């Protein structure tokens, strides 16, 4: 049983060695150090599928672009909502300041009105 596991391990090492040899030959072909006939013997590019041509990558890319667009729009809406909340708070502070200022003015007007009424009552009582 241990012999079969060693065979599997040595088989993997042999395959890695073959891939290394093929890769080295391809590198030599790229440098034009090998004859032209050997260029087509060990082409890994033909055996390994291109990751960009797998079916569904277009949909996946479109999905991620759509997701990115939705996240960007939602982030913009959140910032807009925060901006509106801050603006509303500032306007409420302005209104409350005006109301307190007008309240003081109204109190002053009431005092002046009371003084005028008292003075008119005094003048009316003096005339009678």
From Swiss-Prot:
Protein name: Leucine-rich single-pass membrane protein 1
Transmembrane feature ranges: 66-86
Coiled-coil segments on the chain, per record: 90-111
Keyword Membrane: yes
Residues with Phosphoserine modification: 24
GO CC list: membrane
Sorted UniProt keywords: Coiled coil, Membrane, Phosphoprotein, Transmembrane, Transmembrane helix
Membrane topology: Single-pass membrane protein
Pfam families: DUF4577 (PF15145)
Chief place where the protein resides: membrane
Cross-referenced PANTHER family: LEUCINE-RICH SINGLE-PASS MEMBRANE PROTEIN 1 (PTHR36475:SF1)
Protein location: Membrane
InterPro entries attached to this UniProt entry: DUF4577
């Amino acid at each position: 049983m241990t012999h079969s596991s060693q065979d599997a391990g040595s088989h993997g090492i042999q395959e890695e060695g073959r891939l290394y040899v093929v890769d080295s030959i391809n590198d030599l072909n790229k440098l034009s150090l090998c004859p032209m006939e050997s260029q087509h013997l060990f082409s890994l590019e033909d055996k390994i599928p291109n990751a960009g041509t797998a079916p569904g990558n277009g949909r996946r890319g479109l999905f991620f672009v759509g997701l990115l667009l939705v996240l960007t729009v939602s982030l913009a809406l959140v910032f807009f909502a925060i901006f509106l909340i801050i603006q509303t708070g500032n306007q409420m502070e302005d209104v409350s300041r005006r109301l307190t200022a007008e309240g003081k003015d109204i109190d002053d007007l009431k005092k002046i009105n009371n003084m005028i009424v008292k003075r008119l009552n005094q003048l009316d009582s003096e005339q009678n």
